Amino acid sequence: MLPTVFIVSDGTGITAETFAHSILSQFDQKFRLVRVPFVDSLEKAYATVEKINEAAVHDGRRSIVFTTLVDSESNEIVKRSNALVLDMFQRFVEPLEQELQLKSSHAMGRGHQNADTEEYKTRIEAINFSLAHDDGQSNRNLSEADVILVGVSRSGKTPTSLYLAMQYGVKAANYPLIPEDFERGKLPSALAPHRDKLFGLSIDPQRLSEIRNERRPGSKYAAPENCRYEINEAEAMMRREGIKWLSSTHKSIEEIATTILQEIRLERQSY
């Protein structure tokens, strides 16, 4: 029987779930995750306790609960459940209040009340920009890009660009390096004026072949020898042009994005 983990929040629960994943990944154990978002009333808090207690009876063991409930009364109700309750706000906010000698707002959903703010608009603009400049489909306004990701097809450029836009409000374009570029031995002409904004992604050739085979099985495009050729040529070009790059093979999107932000010295725009 897998241990049951509840993610309880008065909002979407994204913060609590991200934190829970980070903590639980330290243990060689699978868990059954139950998400309980929008617990924004006492009635919902009591209903949540019922769910938690039912799980404890069913599992024959206490559940684990990660909470980000701002309302203290709702929080106390949930803490009375038959579970190990890990209260992120009490753990972090109260020490900060003492250190800063300030009282926090204790307002529910404060972090998400940004629909009309400049940060939100910046993020939406960045997403639209990244979608419009995905896979080299548009060369217009490349000068507005914060970063332009380059690399062979299927090396992780698109998901990384969108993650940078959605999470950080970064205008991230991406542009493919193709065999014709390697034959010419130089960057595509559209990229040359923006050399200082380029960041490269590479990938293990064998892994690239596996990914491409899912898209075009048995094709030259996915053949191991072709993947080796493209990767070798792309990395040689990036070294020759002085472009910073990394291998995406064993890195998560989050790790790739964080590395890119550090390398290009971009401050995070949205939070």
UniProtKB/Swiss-Prot annotation:
Keywords: Kinase, Nucleotide-binding, Serine/threonine-protein kinase, Transferase. The keyword Secreted does not apply. ADP binds at residues 151-158. It catalyses: [pyruvate, water dikinase] + ADP = [pyruvate, water dikinase]-phosphate + AMP + H(+); [pyruvate, water dikinase]-phosphate + phosphate + H(+) = [pyruvate, water dikinase] + diphosphate. It comes from the Bacteria. The keyword Transferase applies. Transmembrane segments: none annotated. It is an enzyme of class 2 (transferase). Pfam families: Kinase-PPPase. Bifunctional serine/threonine kinase and phosphorylase involved in the regulation of the phosphoenolpyruvate synthase (PEPS) by catalyzing its phosphorylation/dephosphorylation. PANTHER family: PYRUVATE, PHOSPHATE DIKINASE REGULATORY PROTEIN 1, CHLOROPLASTIC. This is Putative phosphoenolpyruvate synthase regulatory protein.
